[in-house]
């Protein structure tokens, strides 16, 4: 490990040690926690499972018929000095049918064990730190295609690393009007990928403006940067502390970086810009959100408009209603800042600068793909972000090389509520037109294949299923050209209880 990465590791360990030292001198109070165990059976009219039966479920479900088991425990509490702590461990495994040319499991395996959660967290006032593997919460009651974040949807497993983040902090010069929050973290991508042991940096800053009583605007920028690792073509990539600083500011690479990284930015950078408006009243909330992807400066500068995920969500605060949540999403990613990424210099430009033969115009953003980090924005064969972007089939080495379909037009609608005020349910249906990629070589997408996927899920209440038992049923169906026409069912049995103090 290079000195720069040693520095990062020491910094993370030191930060955790400071928190732990504070914990050990005080007695915990307000402790809570529990354990859970689940078994799930997954059936289908074909070998493959319908899209929504395995999508946005933490990356642990197989994509062919089979069974899944998982279990774990977690806990949290607060010490007398105000420091909070949390911990969790979760394991999962499945046995599923072998894949075929038409359907296959993303990781290429029919039997697999996984670590879903393994973390320790500590917090103080508005700050929180988590170290390990921890799933993030999703927004919009499970009805959205993205869960409220098109770059991090919950479709893949979580990454190992550390995350330092804050709750909303009021600006001292504009209290009750302006507040902000941030994310900062570093992770490792340890799956079988093109650039082995790729490092991952994340930083995000969001702000919130209280326009009037009940009307709030939220905006922000979230950046993810893949860097370091070992390329099969270029060898070990720069990953010193100086290189880490370059990655943080999206600076160009120094000596030892590839020619492309020296001209552009070191590593593979992508992210999203968030524009959101919430109107909240005593009984309900209405949200409109525009989630914009970017791969370079053209996207950050809104050159890729109208690309993005547009979400309209209406939610009653009373969740015991027959209908408590309604959602409608329109997804458009066809433009990608234009049809050309660069152009040759004109004769006049060559006279002024003979060494500059190519000019970047910023098009062909090619979302979730990269020329050097060829696995792109995938993890264990699954798309990390918007799951309607279809990942490439694994090559002969078992490596996923990005996504093959990132130019789409899609609609998604969802409803959630409680039947008879007792049985929670969700219904969603998704329709997409798929255009592949710019300058694609796969003729399959020339015909613009269409796809419809639907889901109906419900959970029996404890008073019906038993005090410590959960019974959940899911019905799913696919119709179209992207996935085989199938209907599927999942039955989930769960047990759990709280720890006794």
Show which residues each predicted segment covers.
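Bacterial Sec-dependent N-terminal signal peptides
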Residues: 1-32, 498-501
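Beta-barrel outer-membrane channel/assembly domains of diderm bacteria
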Residues: 25-136, 143, 150-152, 158-170, ...
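Short loop/turn motifs that connect adjacent beta-strands in outer-membrane beta-barrel proteins
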Residues: 29-34, 74-88, 123-126, 169-181, ...
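Transmembrane beta-strands of outer-membrane beta-barrel pores
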Residues: 39-47, 91-97, 103-105, 124-126, ...
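Outer-membrane beta-barrel translocator domains and adjoining extracellular loop/strand segments
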Residues: 47-54, 98-104, 111, 141-148, ...
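Internal, well-ordered domain-core segments that constitute the primary functional module
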Residues: 137-236
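A conserved mid-domain beta-alpha-beta active-site/ligand-binding segment of alpha/beta enzyme cores
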Residues: 189, 216-276
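Outer-membrane beta-barrel pore domains
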Residues: 261-501
